């Protein structure tokens, strides 16, 4: 069935208007307004809906999820603090309702909101809580994976669990719906709904290993390939490509080296001091002894040059070389050997990082688009690459600046013949290795099906969606959709959520690069950034 591009988002009494990022949306006098292509405005500050008026909670929010060619109404929150058998945790009530005209006789609505088969195979699930100010993420701890299907007009009450939350408000990443700010309340708060805590926890079977929040991390790559940077809460790590900064088998800095090192120096100069570790690495072409010496010499050359570009007096320095002993990737291809020839600079400020992105200073220009390009609100129509597999239109009206993040909800609509393949296989995913994420970590199925290829082009850098690493997991996941298995028919629509680091710009450029087995490059320009 075809779905409308408009959707109604209302607040409950007692809740701030700054609650929901909706698409399509416009900033209008008096509030945040959503509108459809026909221009009919829908004001998010409207009176409570009938469903909200009948609810016992005065702090829940009506939202809409658009996926699988259907529109689902979801009553969200508030997040409720509870205790059970001496353990503190939180429960997020979600009441999901299908429309009366739903096409399918039954639908697993829980899989849309909580994740389906691929998510059940691991710890990562699409439903998450975000603290944009503190750069933290809570993943739902729910282990339950089997739910009753829902027919047209039917409803399902879900009670996913999370660990304890110490914030007053959090932003819910509601898969295929948006970013919804909800209050966090105690169980005895007048705004809290009545909950059967024992039953909710018994059904959820919470995973204790996922109780604690994890840090949001930021990854960027210079467009000229000279550097890549990763920022966590404690440190910033910059890989400087040796092929740019040094000649072959040499420890003498090239004339182009400063293009890479100035950006590193600016990052260091933004902090008052701390620990600075500079480590050289090589490929495995020469013998061990030669590579060890070369890596040490290159690390020293970088340290000396950084000391001339910025004051390192307040930094405790460690300069060393690892030779070929710690490759970033396998040395079995030229591309792999090139990645391993690097000098790693780890900046650990005494008071931690300030969530700032690592920015290069090389002056590389934004490359020409290799696929369809349009302004974000207009939308770009994309064919299925060289193989001609389907067609979709990608649209992004705006992104919301909240805390240290930019939050976007893209609208994906099937074109002539539809998408033909799942949205997570080429249309929106990172076009690198099939099961690997952008860092080269083996990610499994939820890496394959994620919309982790939605990058920003800013200055001289390509900036990836923020990501995070759950306990006992070996690979990071992007703060975006994780299980895009749906295949859109002609006219069917799905919404896709994604969070990026704040670039500090008034408009952004979203770029899905070429590459991979199913290359589908496209670009959206002039996407407004609005305060949230």
What are the residue ranges of the model-derived segments?
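N-terminal secretory signal peptides
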Residues: 1-15, 19-33
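The feature marks short-to-medium sequence segments in extracytoplasmic or secretory-pathway proteins
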Residues: 85, 99-151, 267, 402, ...
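Extracytoplasmic low-complexity, Pro/Thr/Ser/Ala/Gly-rich segments
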Residues: 44-117, 121-124, 133-134, 190-244, ...
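Bacterial lipoprotein signal-peptidase II cleavage site
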Residues: 35-44
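Second-shell loop/turn segments in exported
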Residues: 147, 245-254, 288-292, 484
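Surface-exposed edge beta-strand/loop patches
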Residues: 62-64, 148-214, 349-352, 367-384, ...
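Periplasmic OmpA-like peptidoglycan-binding domain that tethers envelope proteins to the cell wall
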Residues: 281-358
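Periplasmic peptidoglycan-binding/anchoring modules of Gram-negative envelope and division proteins
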Residues: 222-235, 245-279, 303, 307-308, ...
């Amino acid at each position: 069935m075809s779905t409308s591009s408009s959707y109604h988002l209302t607040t409950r009494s007692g809740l701030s208007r700054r609650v929901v990022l909706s698409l399509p949306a416009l900033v209008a006098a008096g509030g945040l307004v959503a509108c459809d292509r026909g221009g009919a405005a829908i004001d998010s500050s409207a009176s409570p809906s009938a469903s909200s008026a009948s609810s016992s909670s005065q702090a829940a929010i009506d939202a809409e999820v658009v996926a699988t060619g259907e529109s689902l109404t979801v009553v969200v929150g508030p997040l409720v603090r509870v205790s059970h058998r001496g353990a503190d945790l939180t429960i997020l009530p979600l009441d999901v309702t299908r429309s009366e005209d739903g096409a399918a006789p039954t639908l697993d609505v829980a899989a849309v909101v909580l994740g389906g088969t691929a998510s059940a195979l691991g710890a990562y699930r699409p439903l998450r809580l975000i603290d944009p100010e503190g750069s933290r993420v809570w993943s739902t701890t729910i282990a339950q994976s089997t739910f009753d299907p829902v027919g047209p007009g039917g409803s399902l009450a879900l009670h996913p669990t999370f660990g304890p939350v110490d914030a007053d408000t959090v932003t819910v990443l509601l898969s295929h719906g948006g970013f919804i700010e909800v209050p966090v309340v105690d169980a005895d708060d007048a705004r809290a709904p009545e909950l059967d805590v024992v039953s909710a926890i018994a059904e959820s079977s919470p995973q204790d290993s996922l109780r604690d929040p994890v840090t949001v991390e930021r990854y960027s790559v210079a467009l000229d390939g000279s550097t890549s940077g990763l920022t966590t809460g404690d440190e910033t790590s910059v890989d400087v490509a040796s092929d740019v900064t040094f000649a072959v088998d040499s420890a003498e800095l090239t004339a182009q080296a400063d293009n890479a090192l100035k950006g590193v120096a600016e990052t260091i100069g933004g902090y008052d001091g701390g620990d600075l570790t500079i480590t050289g690495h090589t490929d495995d072409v020469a013998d061990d002894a030669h590579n060890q010496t070369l890596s040490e010499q290159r690390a020293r050359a970088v340290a000396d040059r950084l000391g001339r570009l910025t004051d390192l007096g307040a930094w405790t320095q460690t300069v060393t070389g690892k030779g070929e002993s710690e490759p970033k990737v396998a040395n079995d291809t030229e591309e792999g050997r090139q990645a391993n020839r690097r000098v790693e600079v780890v900046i650990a400020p005494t008071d931690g990082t300030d969530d700032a992105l690592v920015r290069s200073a090389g002056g590389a220009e934004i490359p020409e688009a290799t696929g369809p390009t349009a302004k974000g609100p207009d939308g770009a129509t994309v064919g299925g690459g060289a193989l001609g597999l389907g067609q979709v239109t990608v649209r992004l009206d705006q992104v919301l600046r909240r805390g240290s993040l930019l939050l976007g909800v893209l609208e994906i609509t099937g074109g002539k013949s539809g998408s033909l393949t799942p949205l997570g296989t080429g249309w929106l995913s990172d076009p690198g290795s099939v099961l690997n994420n952008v860092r080269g970590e083996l990610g499994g199925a939820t890496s394959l099906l994620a919309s982790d290829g939605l990058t920003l082009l800013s200055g001289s850098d390509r900036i990836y969606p923020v990501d995070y690493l759950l306990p006992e997991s070996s690979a990071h996941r992007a703060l975006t959709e994780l299980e895009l298995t749906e295949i859109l028919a002609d006219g069917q629509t799905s919404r896709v959520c994604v969070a990026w680091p704040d670039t500090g710009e008034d408009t952004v450029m979203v770029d899905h690069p070429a590459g991979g087995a199913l290359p589908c490059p496209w670009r959206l320009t002039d996407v407004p950034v609005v305060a949230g």
